[in-house]
Amino acid sequence: MITAQEVEEKLKRGPFHQWLGLKVLAVDEGSIEIEATWREEWVVNPDRKYTHGGILAALVDLTADWALVSKTGRGVPTIDMRVDYHRAAMPGNLV
């Protein structure tokens, strides 16, 4: 099984993932916990300070992919994805 350190090393190779400030907190077979370091550039509404949905969707997508890697040993491309937002994500690291 792939380790948290191995996943983090692979993630940090991509400039977008570097920009997201990703840190792998835990990996188990079929599951993973990833933290993204808060950035002011994620704010979509300066008055309300909530996070742009595209950032959240990107985190859902990459986390799901790495959960599959932890189970199967290989990633697969996302063919279709839908995200239902239940509330706004406010400033602070996202896990």
Regions found by a protein language model. Name each.
Residues M1-V95:
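Terminal targeting signals and extreme-terminal segments of soluble enzymes
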